[in-house]
A protein has these predicted regions:
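Short glycine/serine/proline-enriched coil/turn segments at secondary-structure junctions
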Residues: 28, 138, 170-173
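A conserved helix-loop-beta module that forms one wall/lid of the active-site cleft
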Residues: 83-149
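ATP-binding N-terminal substructure of ATP-dependent carboxylate-amine bond-forming enzymes
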Residues: 1-90
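Phosphate-binding site of ATP-dependent enzymes
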Residues: 147-194
Length: 194
């Protein structure tokens, strides 16, 4: 992704650089190929936003493209601070991010627009097999197929963040597709990457 940004930046000007940040830049592939890389605090640290803003100001950065889902809400909530400094963050509004970060709310959003999605089960009305995952999870951490009631461990059943959904067999019945879409500042689709 960084190399794609570098290629596109070179089409506009020789002076545009692509910078990257990470808690541990030496462990980040993006930081290794970026024109410059910087260490920043963890996303859950109080000083995270200030550190990103300071870096952007110090290095005349005018555009920030978040690539980690866990940073989206914090950056969306701080958007006005960045915009006041002439720094644009390519990000959805905080309300939409909140809906997308809580899978229970995402299901409601899909239903509102008649988009089919897996049924969410009440804990006492599970249908097997089902799929268990934290409602606010990321990167499939904690996600698990539950084949039978015997697969329900105490850790799973007592975790208040765990939700249960209809199991969708993406290996044999359905295909999963991910599409990243980028819009301009007027909301026009500029690029769709499957």
């Amino acid at each position: 992704l960084v190399q794609d940004f570098q290629t596109e930046a070179a089409r506009f000007s020789d002076g545009i650089g692509v910078f990257a940040t990470d808690l541990n830049p030496h462990m980040s592939s993006a930081c290794h190929v970026a024109d410059r890389a910087f260490s920043v605090p963890r996303i859950d640290a109080a000083e995270y936003i200030d550190s990103i803003l300071e870096l952007a100001q110090q290095h005349d950065i005018g555009l920030i493209v978040p690539t980690i889902d866990t940073e989206l809400l914090k950056l969306a909530e701080a958007r006005d601070r960045f915009e006041a400094e002439g720094i644009h963050i390519v990000i959805s509004d905080a309300k939409l991010i909140t809906l997308c970060c809580d899978k229970r709310l995402t299901a409601g959003l899909f239903a509102q627009y008649s988009i089919r999605s897996p049924e969410i089960y009440e804990r006492d009305r599970l249908v097997f097999p089902c799929f268990a995952k934290p409602y606010d999870g990321s990167r499939a951490i904690g996600a698990k197929k539950i084949n039978t009631p015997a697969d329900l461990t105490v850790d799973i059943t007592e975790d208040p963040k765990m939700m249960f959904a209809q199991y969708i067999d993406i290996e044999n019945t359905f295909s999963e597709f991910t599409v990243d879409m980028y819009y301009d500042r007027q909301g026009r689709l500029k690029c769709a990457i499957p």
